[in-house]
From Swiss-Prot:
It comes from the Bacteria. One of its GO terms (cellular component) is cytosol. Its EC number is 6.3.2.1. This is Pantothenate synthetase. Keywords: ATP-binding, Cytoplasm, Ligase, Nucleotide-binding, Pantothenate biosynthesis. Beta-alanine binds at Q60. Belongs to the pantothenate synthetase family. The keyword Cytoplasm applies. The active site is at H36 (proton donor). It comes from Francisella tularensis subsp. holarctica (strain LVS). The reaction proceeds by a bi uni uni bi ping pong mechanism.
Length: 261
C-alpha cells in the first residue's frame, strides 16, 4: 500500500495510474470499523485501484469538543487498510486541504440541508460538502463509496456531484450494525460499557415499535438514560439522533424493516 501524506505526493501517484484503470474511492475520518471495511471490500470488488482517505475535517464539526475527542488510531487504521490490500492511502493535513484557511465554502440551499442534521448541527453540511468536493477534485475517482447510515449526507453529495458535473458514480452501501441493531460508528469507541447497555435498550425499543406515536417513543428512549435530540419520519424512513452521555449517535432505517442487521 502506498501512503500519500500530502497532495503533491498524491498527485504524483494519481498521475502514474493507467487511464483505463477504474478507480474506487472511500473517504473516511479514520477510526475504521467493519462499516468502513464493507465499503472498502465493495470497492475492491468493482475497481482496479482503491483509494482510501483519512482526514478528520474540522469544518464539519459545529462542536469543538466533538472534534477534539474524535477517535484517532492512525497506525491501527494503516494496518487494517494494508490487510485489505488497499492500493493508496491519502492522509492529508488540514494545511493541505485548507491551505489558505476555509475561505470558500459550499452553502447548500436545499430543504433537506436544513432539517434533521442540518438543523441540529449548523454549518455541518457546508463543511462536509466542501471537503467532499475538494477530495473528489483531488482523487478524481470513477466510483465513490458511501454508507447508508449517513443517508441525509448521501442525498446532498448526490446533488453536489450532479450540480458540479463531477464524472463520478456514487455507490451507496447498507448500514452495518451490531447484533443489537446499533449502527457501527467510529464514535462507538467512546461509549462505556454502561453506555452500550443503554444503546442496546434503545434498539430493543426501536425493534419493537411501529413508529405510529413518536412522542410516546421519545419518552421510552429518554427513559433509558439517553437524551433523544430528534426522531422524525421522512418519506418511508425513520431518522433519529440521540446522546448517550457525551457521545452523539445518529441512525436511519426503513420504517417497514426497522433497525435490522
Amino acid at each position: 500500500m502506498i501512503i500519500a501524506d500530502n497532495i503533491k505526493q498524491f498527485h504524483s501517484i494519481r498521475n502514474s495510474l493507467i487511464k483505463q484503470q477504474k478507480i474506487g474511492f472511500v473517504p473516511t475520518m479514520g477510526a475504521l470499523h467493519n462499516g468502513h471495511i464493507s465499503l472498502i471490500k465493495k470497492a475492491k470488488s468493482e475497481n482496479d485501484v482503491v483509494i482510501v482517505s483519512i482526514f478528520v475535517n474540522p469544518t464539519q464539526f459545529n462542536n469543538p469538543n466533538d472534534y477534539q475527542t474524535y477517535p484517532n488510531q492512525l497506525q491501527q487504521d494503516i494496518q487494517i487498510l494494508a490487510s485489505l490490500d488497499v492500493d493508496v492511502l491519502f492522509n492529508p493535513s488540514e494545511k493541505d486541504i485548507y491551505p489558505d484557511g476555509n475561505l470558500l465554502r459550499i452553502e447548500p440551499k436545499l430543504e433537506i440541508a436544513n432539517i434533521l442534521e442540518g438543523k441540529s448541527r449548523p454549518g455541518h453540511f457546508s463543511g462536509t460538502l466542501t471537503v467532499v468536493l475538494k477530495l473528489l477534485q483531488i482523487t478524481k475517482p470513477n466510483n465513490l463509496y458511501l454508507g447508508e447510515k449517513d443517508y441525509q449526507q448521501v442525498m446532498l453529495i448526490k446533488q453536489l456531484v450532479k450540480d458540479f458535473f463531477i464524472n463520478t458514480k456514487i455507490i451507496v452501501c447498507p448500514t452495518q450494525r451490531q447484533p443489537s441493531g446499533l449502527p457501527l460508528s467510529s464514535r462507538n469507541k467512546n461509549l462505556t460499557s454502561t453506555d452500550i447497555e443503554i444503546a442496546n435498550k434503545i434498539y430493543e425499543i426501536l425493534r419493537q415499535d411501529d413508529f405510529s406515536n413518536l412522542e410516546e417513543l421519545t419518552n421510552k428512549i429518554n427513559s433509558t438514560g439517553a437524551k433523544l435530540q430528534y426522531i422524525q419520519k421522512l418519506n418511508n424512513r425513520i431518522f433519529l439522533a440521540f446522546y448517550i452521555g457525551k457521545v452523539r449517535l445518529i441512525d436511519n432505517f426503513l420504517k417497514e424493516t426497522g433497525p435490522s442487521c
